[in-house]
């Protein structure tokens, strides 16, 4: 504490607070004594002035404490700050604005300093406070004002400090309001920042969950794809193994004939022979699988038809049907004559059937016919140029005609081979085997009209004559059904193992074409 005493001004600085008397109370005024008035005797505890500017006595005991708490709540509701925070604002305003924004009186400054001491150090205690000199007027005034507060609590002192400062300067309310706005703005920003962080955290958690979900879905998709790929690979290996087994079985049956055919096509060229053999084996396998699928489809259709006809399953079959049922299923007979002749009178045909069985043997004794092998090759131009050198190997099939090339089996042969091609258009082709012992081994060509003409001729004769005529015809088995072949694009070839002695019938069917004749380049030969 520092004190300055002169004729014009008296100032006291306590803890950063400057106290100076009002001009009208300066010691240099006219008639005023040069020395300060003597200090009054100390009043007993509790007999000092109250904390208010009007000198009201404080409320004793618990009533005073309760009143201070209630006053603190009212201040907080009014100013928007807690008591501690509001007192801090008031103290800072007093230190910053004293002598600038407002000019409190000498007594008001003494009271404000005393209240600040009461808040900071508690009630005045003469035993702990140092003595003040007799001539220290301001020190004595300050101590007297502090002692007058008595046992005022810290909260009451802060309340009185705020209320007194508000009475001294009307700018204090504006100062607090600006800080309140700033506080609210900071609180708003804090809440916005917390909300932003909360949203960012939620968004981050959501993205993490989505990423985890996508990762799990991707892992599941990869797992399913891997399982599917493994299953497909296993299926491919199984089919490949099955294919190798089937091809090995088929190749063991056709090795000799394919080798002979390749040797004839490329004599002395082993590499080309092996390439051709592999092509023939692959085509033979594809043809075998196609026939196998057709047989399975036919079996399924037959089973379905059998289920549909279960209502008539109890009807008895004719004797002729029972005989025909014993024929092996892999022998597809197209001997329509034999079928027609069984549908006729049974008594009338018994002697002829017995005679046929004595001469040719029973039908069931016929050997099983092996499946044919068929393939194609693209060298159609070279093939036709080679065939044109032999005029007998080029035949013309007129429009609506069917040309049959009869090729008897050879005593020294085991397999029959055929090759054919056309110029610009396709043609029907099929192979049949006629069970007849022909003494002539020469190849012959027979031209006939459409097969419909033969059927019309058979319809014009009686049943008895037709039965006799059909009975005299030899048995006929279908080796390759007649289908239209794209032989104008590539060479069609095939082979078949002799089922026995007989005649092969190679049919070139142009009955469907009413306007064009077809030139056929063909070649047939046998191998052992």
From Swiss-Prot:
<feature type="modified residue" description="Phosphoserine">
    <location>
        <position position="20"/>
    </location>
</feature>
<feature type="region of interest" description="Disordered">
    <location>
        <begin position="182"/>
        <end position="230"/>
    </location>
</feature>
<feature type="modified residue" description="Phosphoserine">
    <location>
        <position position="13"/>
    </location>
</feature>
<dbReference type="InterPro" id="IPR009038">
    <property type="entry name" value="GOLD_dom"/>
</dbReference>
<dbReference type="GO" id="GO:0016020">
    <property type="term" value="C:membrane"/>
</dbReference>
<keyword id="KW-0175">Coiled coil</keyword>
<dbReference type="InterPro" id="IPR022408">
    <property type="entry name" value="Acyl-CoA-binding_prot_CS"/>
</dbReference>
<keyword id="KW-0007">Acetylation</keyword>
<dbReference type="GO" id="GO:0000139">
    <property type="term" value="C:Golgi membrane"/>
</dbReference>
<dbReference type="InterPro" id="IPR014352">
    <property type="entry name" value="FERM/acyl-CoA-bd_prot_sf"/>
</dbReference>
<feature type="region of interest" description="Disordered">
    <location>
        <begin position="1"/>
        <end position="71"/>
    </location>
</feature>
<feature type="region of interest" description="Q domain; Interaction with PI4KB, TBC1D22A and TBC1D22B">
    <location>
        <begin position="241"/>
        <end position="308"/>
    </location>
</feature>
<feature type="modified residue" description="N-acetylalanine; in Golgi resident protein GCP60, N-terminally processed">
    <location>
        <position position="2"/>
    </location>
</feature>
<keyword id="KW-0444">Lipid biosynthesis</keyword>
<feature type="modified residue" description="Phosphothreonine">
    <location>
        <position position="18"/>
    </location>
</feature>
<keyword id="KW-0496">Mitochondrion</keyword>
<feature type="region of interest" description="Disordered">
    <location>
        <begin position="335"/>
        <end position="362"/>
    </location>
</feature>
<comment type="function">
    <text>(Microbial infection) Plays an essential role in Aichi virus RNA replication by recruiting PI4KB at the viral replication sites.</text>
</comment>
<dbReference type="GO" id="GO:0000062">
    <property type="term" value="F:fatty-acyl-CoA binding"/>
</dbReference>
<dbReference type="InterPro" id="IPR036598">
    <property type="entry name" value="GOLD_dom_sf"/>
</dbReference>
<dbReference type="GO" id="GO:0005794">
    <property type="term" value="C:Golgi apparatus"/>
</dbReference>
<feature type="site" description="Membrane-binding">
    <location>
        <position position="399"/>
    </location>
</feature>
<feature type="domain" description="GOLD">
    <location>
        <begin position="384"/>
        <end position="526"/>
    </location>
</feature>
<dbReference type="GO" id="GO:0006694">
    <property type="term" value="P:steroid biosynthetic process"/>
</dbReference>
<comment type="subunit">
    <text>(Microbial infection) Interacts (via GOLD domain) with 3A proteins from various picornaviruses, including poliovirus, enterovirus A71, enterovirus D68, hepatitis A virus, human parechovirus 1, poliovirus, Human rhinovirus-14 (Hrv-14), coysackievirus B2, coysackievirus B3, coysackievirus B5, Aichi virus and human klassevirus. Interacts (via GOLD domain) with Aichi virus protein 3A; this interaction allows the formation of a 3A/ACBD3/PI4KB complex in order to synthesize PI4P at the viral RNA replication sites. Interacts with Aichi virus protein 2B. Interacts with Aichi virus protein 2C.</text>
</comment>
<feature type="domain" description="ACB">
    <location>
        <begin position="83"/>
        <end position="174"/>
    </location>
</feature>
<feature type="modified residue" description="Phosphoserine">
    <location>
        <position position="47"/>
    </location>
</feature>
<dbReference type="InterPro" id="IPR035984">
    <property type="entry name" value="Acyl-CoA-binding_sf"/>
</dbReference>
<dbReference type="InterPro" id="IPR052269">
    <property type="entry name" value="Golgi-PI4KB_interaction"/>
</dbReference>
<keyword id="KW-0945">Host-virus interaction</keyword>
<keyword id="KW-0443">Lipid metabolism</keyword>
<feature type="compositionally biased region" description="Basic and acidic residues">
    <location>
        <begin position="340"/>
        <end position="350"/>
    </location>
</feature>
<feature type="coiled-coil region">
    <location>
        <begin position="174"/>
        <end position="257"/>
    </location>
</feature>
<dbReference type="InterPro" id="IPR000582">
    <property type="entry name" value="Acyl-CoA-binding_protein"/>
</dbReference>
<feature type="region of interest" description="Membrane-binding">
    <location>
        <begin position="514"/>
        <end position="516"/>
    </location>
</feature>
<comment type="subunit">
    <text>Homodimer. Interacts with the C-terminal cytoplasmic domain of giantin/GOLGB1. Interacts with PBR and PKA regulatory subunit RI-alpha. Does not interact with PKA regulatory subunit RI-beta nor PKA regulatory subunit RII-alpha. Interacts (via Q domain) with PI4KB (via N-terminus). Interacts (via Q domain) with TBC1D22A and TBC1D22B; interactions with PI4KB and with TBC1D22A and TBC1D22B are mutually exclusive. Interacts with C10ORF76 and RAB11B.</text>
</comment>
<feature type="region of interest" description="Charged amino-acid region (CAR)">
    <location>
        <begin position="182"/>
        <end position="240"/>
    </location>
</feature>
<dbReference type="GO" id="GO:0034237">
    <property type="term" value="F:protein kinase A regulatory subunit binding"/>
</dbReference>
<feature type="compositionally biased region" description="Pro residues">
    <location>
        <begin position="34"/>
        <end position="45"/>
    </location>
</feature>
<dbReference type="Pfam" id="PF13897">
    <property type="entry name" value="GOLD_2"/>
</dbReference>
<feature type="modified residue" description="Phosphoserine">
    <location>
        <position position="43"/>
    </location>
</feature>
<dbReference type="GO" id="GO:0005739">
    <property type="term" value="C:mitochondrion"/>
</dbReference>
């Amino acid at each position: 504490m520092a004190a300055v005493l002169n004729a014009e001004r008296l100032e006291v600085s306590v803890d950063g607070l400057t106290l100076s008397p009002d001009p009208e109370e300066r010691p240099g005024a006219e008639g005023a004594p040069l020395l300060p008035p003597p200090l009054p005797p100390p009043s007993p505890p509790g007999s000092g002035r109250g904390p208010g500017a009007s000198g009201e006595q404080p409320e004793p005991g618990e009533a005073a404490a309760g009143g201070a708490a209630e006053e603190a709540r009212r201040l907080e509701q009014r100013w928007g700050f807690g008591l501690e925070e509001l007192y801090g604002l008031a103290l800072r305003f007093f230190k910053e604005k004293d002598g600038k924004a407002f000019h409190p009186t000498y007594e008001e400054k003494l009271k404000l300093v005393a209240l600040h001491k009461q808040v900071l150090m508690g009630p005045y205690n003469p035993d702990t406070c140092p003595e003040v000199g007799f001539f220290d007027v301001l020190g004595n005034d300050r101590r007297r004002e502090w002692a007058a507060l008595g046992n005022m609590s810290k909260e009451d002192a802060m309340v009185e400090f705020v209320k007194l400062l508000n009475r001294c300067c009307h700018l204090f309310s504006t100062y607090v309001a600006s800080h309140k706005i700033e506080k609210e703005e900071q609180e708003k920003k804090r809440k916005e920042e917390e909300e932003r962080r909360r949203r960012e955290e939620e968004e981050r958690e959501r993205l993490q969950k989505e990423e985890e979900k996508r990762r799990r879905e991707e892992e599941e998709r990869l797992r399913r794809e891997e399982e599917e790929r493994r299953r497909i690979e296993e299926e491919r290996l199984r089919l490949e193994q099955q294919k190798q087994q089937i091809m090995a079985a088929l190749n063991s049956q056709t090795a000799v004939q394919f080798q002979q055919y390749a040797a004839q096509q490329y004599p002395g060229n082993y590499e080309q022979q092996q390439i051709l053999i592999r092509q023939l084996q692959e085509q033979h396998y594809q043809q075998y699988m196609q026939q196998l699928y057709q047989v399975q489809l036919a079996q399924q259709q037959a089973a379905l038809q059998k289920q549909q006809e279960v209502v008539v399953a109890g009807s008895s079959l004719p004797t002729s049907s029972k005989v025909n049922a014993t024929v092996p299923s892999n022998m597809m007979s197209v001997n329509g004559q034999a079928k027609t002749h069984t549908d006729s009178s049974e008594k009338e045909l018994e002697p002829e059937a017995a005679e046929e069985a004595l001469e040719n043997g029973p039908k069931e004794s016929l050997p099983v016919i092996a499946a044919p092998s068929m393939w194609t090759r693209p060298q159609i131009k070279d093939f036709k140029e080679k065939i044109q050198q032999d005029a007998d190997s080029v035949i013309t099939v007129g429009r609506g005609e069917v040309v049959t090339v009869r090729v008897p089996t050879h005593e020294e042969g085991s397999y029959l081979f055929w090759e054919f091609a056309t110029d610009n258009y396709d043609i029907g082709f099929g192979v049949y085997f006629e069970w007849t012992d022909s003494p002539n081994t020469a190849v012959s060509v027979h031209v006939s009209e459409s097969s419909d003409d033969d059927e019309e001729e058979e319809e014009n004769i009686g049943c008895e004559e037709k039965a006799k005529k059909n009975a005299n015809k030899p048995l006929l088995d279908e080796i390759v059904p007649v289908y239209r072949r794209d032989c104008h694009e590539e060479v069609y070839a095939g082979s078949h193992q002799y089922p026995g002695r007989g005649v092969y019938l190679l049919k070139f069917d142009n009955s469907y074409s009413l306007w064009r004749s077809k030139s056929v380049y063909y070649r047939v030969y046998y191998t052992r």
